[in-house]
Amino acid sequence: MGGRGQWSRSSRKRIRYKSVGTLSQSAIDATGINHSAGETIYIGSDRKGHISKHKDEFTDFNGTYNRIGEIIGSPDYIGKHPNGQSIEFVKRLEENTLVAVRINQSKLTVRTMHTLSEVTFNKRLAKGRYRRYN
């Protein structure tokens, strides 16, 4: 797929993918997923439309959307969705922001981004779903 920040096409669905970061060893250790450090994390061209459904939750939607790579690379908290199919990167920006990355055998892809209320965040933290990221 193209280099960081470049879009490349998927012939199957006509979705273009862009690199937004890489999977760190710390993320692997924290979530126990079976992937290798340094694997590229992509976002599909179809995701912004999906994610924009949550735009009213954000003080600055476009600014936060443009920080997805930073959220993945330097989250404050990390966890795994209970269904085991995605990693959740949480960063405390203007809002508690969650970026979910789908765990797939062939590719790691951003699935969604949305805010977390303080109540929801604290419940998930208390249940052990999230842990502080190094």
Predicted segments, located by residue:
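Ribonuclease/tRNase effector modules and their secretory precursors
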Residues: 1-134
